[in-house]
Amino acid sequence: MSQSAVSFQISPVSKAQDPLIQQKIDLKTKPPGALGQLESLALQIARVQATDSQQADQPQNTVLKIVHPTMLVFAGDHGIVAEGVSIAPSEVTRQMVQNFAHGGAAINVFCRQVGFKLEVIDCGILTPVEGVEGIIDQRLGAGTGAIHLEPAMALETVDKGFAMARDLIERHHQAGCNLVAFGEMGIGNTSAAAAIMAAIMQLDVIDCVGRGTGINSETLERKLMLIELALLLHQSALTGPKSVLACLGGFEIVQMTGAMLAAAERKMLVVVDGFIATAAALVAVQIAPNVRDYLIFAHQSDEQGHQRMLEFLQAKPLLSLGLRLGEGTGAALALPLIQASVNFYNQMASFSDAGIEAVV
């Protein structure tokens, strides 16, 4: 039975009321712009939440909220790993998924610290984890095809992944969640992300490929060669963003892309983690450009090419910590900054409230 094509209807946020929102920000008891990037973040959040409220014509009266923030970590394996493009074998994906379920990974620690609910989704690791609670089964297969030899997956598998992702987001939306963050786990997924980046941005592979979690120079050369072979093999088939995912992507990247689109469709804020999640965002923006309005980019990772992708998406990340772990760790660490933007917008006094002469 074939999977029907999945489409998303994403409304752009309205910028018509930006002057009123900006005025509210500027009249807080501080010099204009003194809170730096927190101010532009508050403006973005106010655009999204005023558009989705009954006060779209009076956005300055909208009380900003972060409700039930949820971290979704998507896991999948990659056929290209058999060629030795990573320091770790594919089995580590499964072992780390178990670690997530048992609460022992960095993402677990950070989510507990900042107040994220964490869900782990098996999108297609080689061997499913059985008998362990807390892992959501949304498997599209047992690892992707090796992209230098064959497509990662069929085009209809992409739509199946999008449909699963939409259902996942709908469940959280119905529970009242209005902010979702995206992380991933998949040995070899920097290869898939770099291939996606090269295909969409029309860049040389060498400008997109990095050392992942720390490969040596010999392995890096092999990684470069295999991705170049993949792009050459699929050149004629790369006719659009979905075909890029089908030829070059990963099951976890497909479902991240679909979940970003579904969350934006529901006017939820979307926090994008590092290199892999940004590759998913890159595809999502190609499918539905309006999704960009809802994306908050958490950090610039230490992975080669991430800065280029962020610049292409006109994104200014909140953090730059030299992270190269993935899992959603950077997105988790960004949540307190997002909450700080909401809190100053809602709670700071204006000059008139405080009886202070304005410095605007």
Swiss-Prot record:
<comment type="function">
    <text>Catalyzes the synthesis of alpha-ribazole-5'-phosphate from nicotinate mononucleotide (NAMN) and 5,6-dimethylbenzimidazole (DMB).</text>
</comment>
<dbReference type="InterPro" id="IPR023195">
    <property type="entry name" value="Nict_dMeBzImd_PRibTrfase_N"/>
</dbReference>
<dbReference type="Pfam" id="PF02277">
    <property type="entry name" value="DBI_PRT"/>
</dbReference>
<comment type="similarity">
    <text>Belongs to the CobT family.</text>
</comment>
<keyword id="KW-0808">Transferase</keyword>
<protein>
    <recommendedName>
        <fullName>Nicotinate-nucleotide--dimethylbenzimidazole phosphoribosyltransferase</fullName>
        <ecNumber>2.4.2.21</ecNumber>
    </recommendedName>
</protein>
<keyword id="KW-0328">Glycosyltransferase</keyword>
<keyword id="KW-0169">Cobalamin biosynthesis</keyword>
<dbReference type="GO" id="GO:0008939">
    <property type="term" value="F:nicotinate-nucleotide-dimethylbenzimidazole phosphoribosyltransferase activity"/>
</dbReference>
<dbReference type="InterPro" id="IPR036087">
    <property type="entry name" value="Nict_dMeBzImd_PRibTrfase_sf"/>
</dbReference>
<dbReference type="InterPro" id="IPR017846">
    <property type="entry name" value="Nict_dMeBzImd_PRibTrfase_bact"/>
</dbReference>
<feature type="active site" description="Proton acceptor">
    <location>
        <position position="327"/>
    </location>
</feature>
<dbReference type="InterPro" id="IPR003200">
    <property type="entry name" value="Nict_dMeBzImd_PRibTrfase"/>
</dbReference>
<dbReference type="GO" id="GO:0009236">
    <property type="term" value="P:cobalamin biosynthetic process"/>
</dbReference>
<comment type="pathway">
    <text>Nucleoside biosynthesis; alpha-ribazole biosynthesis; alpha-ribazole from 5,6-dimethylbenzimidazole: step 1/2.</text>
</comment>
